[in-house]
Amino acid sequence: RYATAALGAMDRPADAAPMVARLRAIDGTIDGTAAYLRRTYVDSAAARLMDGIRRAGFH
């Protein structure tokens, strides 16, 4: 999740594509990823990670 978010933050969605596919396999949907992050991190950290993950191409 960190690597996916980092690549998204650097506007490198092509490089993040394999990781986005893995997140889909693990979490199912973007909502599943968001739910995991909200349970695990404080709101501000979860929001920042989700921003990067969305920018990586996970919608």
Where would I find each of the regions flagged by the language model?
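Alpha-helical protein-protein interaction modules
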Residues: 1-59
